[in-house]
């Protein structure tokens, strides 16, 4: 079973991805992250996604949460995305990054970091539900790949 940590757990897309993870085969929730000081840190994710208590508490401690992860699903603003990308690369944890666009410097960081881990870029397609399922599908796929940078074109047919 693949264990996924989701960042931005207190946001709409984070909650949607978490809800879908509970209904997915072959992948499960290992943890949920939010930025330091977010009001939902310490909250059970089930309370946010309407499932009751799940035992998974939102944290702002990447190092502790990452110990449980086979993959990180990260789709919060770029500055934070790239922080988690660098941290994932240091620990060789694959990462799925949801994005609506990266500038030149951000793309350089992605390319450099993906040399040390596996990274897949998932563009936000405008439909949150489609994006959430694409992110989960990408997370299940990326853990079996060699180090490098990938995009959704690479997992077509999976």
Roles of regions detected by a PLM:
Residues 2-35, 53, 67, 115-116, ...:
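Active-site-lining helix/loop region of Rossmann-like oxidoreductase modules
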Residues 11-14, 77, 92:
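Alpha-helical hinge/cap motifs
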Residues 44-47, 109-111:
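Short, aromatic/basic amphipathic alpha-helical patches
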Residues 66-73, 90-95:
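Short acidic/histidine-rich motifs immediately flanking catalytic phosphotransfer sites
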């Amino acid at each position: 079973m693949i264990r996924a940590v989701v960042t931005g757990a207190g946001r709409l897309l984070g909650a949607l991805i978490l809800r879908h993870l509970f209904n997915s085969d072959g992948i499960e929730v290992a943890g949920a992250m939010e930025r330091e000081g977010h009001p939902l840190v310490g909250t059970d994710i089930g309370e946010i996604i309407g499932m009751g208590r799940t035992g998974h508490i939102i944290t702002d401690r990447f190092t502790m949460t990452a110990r449980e992860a086979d993959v990180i699903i990260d789709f919060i603003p770029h500055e934070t995305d790239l922080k988690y990308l660098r941290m994932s690369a240091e620990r060789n944890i694959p990462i799925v990054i949801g994005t609506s666009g990266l500038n030149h410097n951000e793309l350089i960081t992605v390319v450099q970091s993906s040399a040390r881990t596996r990274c897949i870029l998932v563009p936000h397609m405008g439909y949150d539900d489609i994006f959430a399922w694409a992110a989960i599908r990408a997370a299940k796929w990326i853990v079996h790949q060699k180090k490098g940078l990938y995009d959704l074109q690479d997992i077509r047919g999976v």
